[in-house]
UniProtKB/Swiss-Prot annotation:
PROSITE patterns: RADICAL_SAM (PS51918). This is Lipoyl synthase. The keyword Transferase applies. It comes from Aquifex aeolicus (strain VF5). It catalyses: [[Fe-S] cluster scaffold protein carrying a second [4Fe-4S](2+) cluster] + N(6)-octanoyl-L-lysyl-[protein] + 2 oxidized [2Fe-2S]-[ferredoxin] + 2 S-adenosyl-L-methionine + 4 H(+) = [[Fe-S] cluster scaffold protein] + N(6)-[(R)-dihydrolipoyl]-L-lysyl-[protein] + 4 Fe(3+) + 2 hydrogen sulfide + 2 5'-deoxyadenosine + 2 L-methionine + 2 reduced [2Fe-2S]-[ferredoxin]. The lineage of its organism: Bacteria, Pseudomonadati, Aquificota, Aquificia, Aquificales. Its main location: cytoplasm. GO terms for cellular component: cytoplasm.
């Protein structure tokens, strides 16, 4: 369910800039329901390392296939786009790049470094893939001091074989656990998409698992099927059910919880930081 298209002139301005800069956003590639709101406010989650993913998650609308090589100029194009938009809080994500030895970690690090070296007081949040469980790759990213390290578990362990093909629940938890071991000053975040057929008790158990690795921020949102070839929606959750999960999350000790049908992991990212 898409939100009404607001701020049309700003929406067009951001899209025009992205095309000119040859940059991608996960907002567009994943058909995010919040795109008009975020673009209207001149915010976006930039997607580096191309727009083709080496994984085939059953819910994701990002193009699958063999990606192109890494573009060494991309961090500088990203810098110019951020400057033009006047952003002070930037979210960077990527497709999963299992074809790269470090999963793209060094490119993430370069993007963070270029932004921080050229824009005073810039805050950078990263939404990273699992780097195939490579702890050294995670260290490379954290060395550049992003303000938030986001890695999404996406669904409950039972549904991984059908929903997150190629991923591993324990590996994803380890990314969040290792992040705190490497640098406690960096906030961690994760998200769950609901509607694949998970049970309430399974969702709560995942929330408990996230707190057990000291995850700070939690996002829960409704799954909307992008096309007939994607995983079907098994259940649509009510506003009341999302509210209940939010209350449970705060009771567990999460610093900030966004639990709404249209919530996505980067939605209101800066607000989560302000809450700390």
């Amino acid at each position: 369910m898409m939100k009404p298209v607001l701020h049309f002139s700003k929406l067009y301005e951001v899209k025009k800039l992205l095309r000119k800069s040859r940059l991608y956003t996960v907002c567009e590639e994943s058909r995010c329901p919040n795109i008009s709101e975020c673009f209207g406010n001149k915010t976006a989650t930039f997607m580096i390392l191309g727009n083709r993913c080496t994984r085939r998650c059953a819910f994701c609308n990002v193009e699958k296939g063999f990606p192109k090589g890494v573009d060494p100029e991309e961090p500088y194009r990203l810098l110019e786009a951020v400057k033009t938009l006047g952003l002070k809080y930037v979210v960077i994500t990527s497709v999963t790049r299992d074809d790269l030895p470090d999963g793209g970690a060094s490119h993430f690090a370069k993007c963070i470094r270029v932004l921080k070296e050229n824009i005073e007081d810039i805050k950078v949040e990263v939404l990273i893939p699992d780097f195939r469980g490579n702890k050294k790759a995670l260290e490379v990213v954290l060395k550049e001091k992003p303000v938030v390290l986001n890695h999404n578990v996406e669904t409950v362990p039972r549904l991984y074989p059908s929903v997150r093909i190629g991923a591993n629940y324990k590996r994803s938890l380890n990314i969040l656990k290792w992040s705190k071991e490497i640098d406690k000053s960096v906030y961690t975040k994760s998200a769950l998409i609901l509607g694949f057929g998970e049970r309430k008790e399974e969702v709560i158990k995942v929330m408990e698992d996230l707190r057990s690795v000291d995850c700070d921020f939690l996002v829960l949102g409704q799954y909307y099927q992008p096309s007939l070839k994607h995983h079907p929606v098994v259940k649509y959750y009510s506003e009341e059910e999302f509210k209940e999960f939010e209350e449970i999350g705060y009771e567990m000790g999460f610093k900030f919880v966004v639990s709404k049908p249209n919530a996505r992991s980067s939605y209101k990212a800066f607000e989560s930081l302000l809450s700390t």
